[in-house]
Curated annotation (Swiss-Prot):
The lineage of its organism: Eukaryota, Viridiplantae, Streptophyta, Embryophyta, Tracheophyta. Keywords: Allergen, Antimicrobial, Carbohydrate metabolism, Chitin degradation, Chitin-binding, Disulfide bond, Glycosidase, Hydrolase, Pathogenesis-related protein, Plant defense, Polysaccharide degradation, Signal. It comes from Persea americana (Avocado). It catalyses: Random endo-hydrolysis of N-acetyl-beta-D-glucosaminide (1->4)-beta-linkages in chitin and chitodextrins. This is Endochitinase. Residues 26-66 form the Chitin-binding type-1 domain. One of its GO terms (molecular function) is chitin binding. One of its GO terms (biological process) is chitin catabolic process. It is an enzyme of class 3 (hydrolase). CDD domains: chitinase_GH19, ChtBD1_GH19_hevein.
């Protein structure tokens, strides 16, 4: 005889959904287009919001830190404005496209709206997450070069949007149809691209980015929120960057076979592994590590292990030799 192992609260929730029919759809996660739960609640594997272990446990999809506030007053208690300015020392340089846009207050407001960000684990873990987030996004927006004043890792957040004449980055989908005349090229700290990312990001933060993608380059809080949405949200088969840096991700046997072990390097793999990882040493990965080490030093925390992805297969490359022909 086979017994159902689902917990009673989730069974009751599913039963209510069945009785309510179309009026009671899943609330979050992949079942709801990547939506986040209100009030920082955890999103269960089934797409429901809650704060108990049924929702926030190992199978949780997003905001898995629960609703317990971090000790000491949130993100601002972990990184001061002076340290933030020292990290992003040249972001307001006259030569930087984003001059005056990326402010400390905008970062703090956006960060505090994502429950779980920099609030999981001890103080060192929380600071390390801030360092990792700002490092990865600094690489995406860097204006530095090898001989730049104060070094190449003092020039993060110099750029705001993709340069040149970028395409519209529109991949028509039923769920996220592109708006007429709108382009979904890279904008903001993570350089969010494509309608299928703008759509769920906007839904998660409560703003229509399909019809207003330029908001990512005109409203600094929205801009930071899109990057934090990407950071906090797993996109199968990839874990979230948040879960990796806070130690909540446990690699599978396939991950281990692919060289994907817990550490900063897996975050690089999540963000751009198909281009940068599994190819030996390359300057882009080294640049991401350089930012990270500098920021960890400024925050007074250790780096952890497995910083690079030089020998990691990307999440899009199978370890199964038959996969390519299947």
């Amino acid at each position: 005889m086979v017994y159902c192992t689902a917990s009673l609260p989730l069974l009751l929730l599913l039963l209510v959904g069945l009785l309510a029919g179309e009026a009671f759809a899943e609330q979050c996660g992949r079942q709801a287009g990547g939506a986040l739960c209100p009030g920082g609640l955890c999103c269960s594997q089934f797409g429901w919001c809650g704060s108990t272990s049924d929702y926030c446990g190992p199978t949780c999809q997003s905001q898995c830190g629960g609703v317990t506030p971090s000790p000491g007053g949130g993100v601002a208690s972990l990184i001061s404005q002076s340290v933030f300015n020292q990290m992003l020392k040249h972001r307001n340089d006259a030569a930087c496209q984003a001059k005056g846009f990326y402010t400390y207050n905008a970062f703090i407001a956006a960060a505090n709206s994502f429950n779980g960000f920099a609030s999981v684990g001890d103080t060192a873990t929380r600071k390390r997450e801030i360092a990792a987030f700002l490092a990865q996004t600094s690489h995406e927006t860097t204006g530095g070069w090898a001989t730049a004043p104060d070094g190449p890792y003092a020039w993060g957040y110099c750029f705001l949007k993709e340069q040149g004449n970028p395409p519209d980055y529109c991949v028509p989908t039923a769920q996220w149809p592109c708006a007429p005349g709108k382009k979904y090229y890279g904008r903001g700290p993570i350089q969010i691209s494509y309608n299928y990312n703008y759509g769920p990001a906007g839904r998660a933060i409560g703003y229509d980015l399909i019809n207003n993608p330029d908001a990512v380059a005109t409203d600094p809080v929205i801009s930071f929120k899109t990057a934090l949405w990407f950071w906090m949200t797993p996109q199968s088969p990839k874990p979230s960057c948040h879960n990796v840096i806070t130690g909540r991700w446990t690699p599978s046997a396939a991950d281990r076979a692919a060289g994907r072990l817990p550490g900063y390097g897996v975050i690089t793999n999540i963000i751009n592994g198909g281009i940068e990882c599994g190819k030996g040493f390359n300057d882009k990965v080294a640049d991401r590590i350089g930012f990270y080490k500098r920021y960890c030093d400024l925050l007074g925390v250790s780096y952890g292990s497995n910083l690079d992805c030089y020998n990691q297969r990307s999440f899009g490359v199978s370890t199964n030799p038959l996969a390519a022909s299947s």
